[in-house]
Amino acid sequence: MYNVPESECFMAKYRAVLRGEEIKLFTPNDSISLYSQVNFDNQSLQKSAVDYFAVSILGGILSSVKAHFAQQRADIVEMEGKIWLNLANPLTLLGVRGYSEQPVINDGKIKIFISSDLTDDIFTQLTQNALRCCFIYNTIIKAFPLNIEFEQVL
């Protein structure tokens, strides 16, 4: 498909299959299931594409921070993150008459709490450098505004 050396580009490959109401997504070593683009039922246990998308963004950024801190020999005692996505025009997805605007994620916010014993300057430098090394963050910010706040907690 592409003739690019892996040192310059890594081709990630995935597969999906529809099985009844379930869409089975295959990763290299596992599979996950989803049932819809977005699920507006807070009680439902069925995962949606937006659920996986949101937690993948958050998980990718936390993973990048963890790896970057480890490379710099900076300890993270604990880390927790929260993500909010602003889903515009959701009624279009529900087929509500009179609503036909394209559904889109307008923007998002992430708040990450990190317990460490770093100075504020070093903490800020490490977190910003971690974002610069994050595939997911660097891709997402081209699609919609994503505000990320880091807070150091003791």
Task: Outline where the language-model segments fall.
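Extended beta-strand/beta-hairpin segments
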Residues: 1-55, 66-154
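Alpha-helical metal-binding/catalytic segments enriched in His/Glu/Asp
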Residues: 60-61
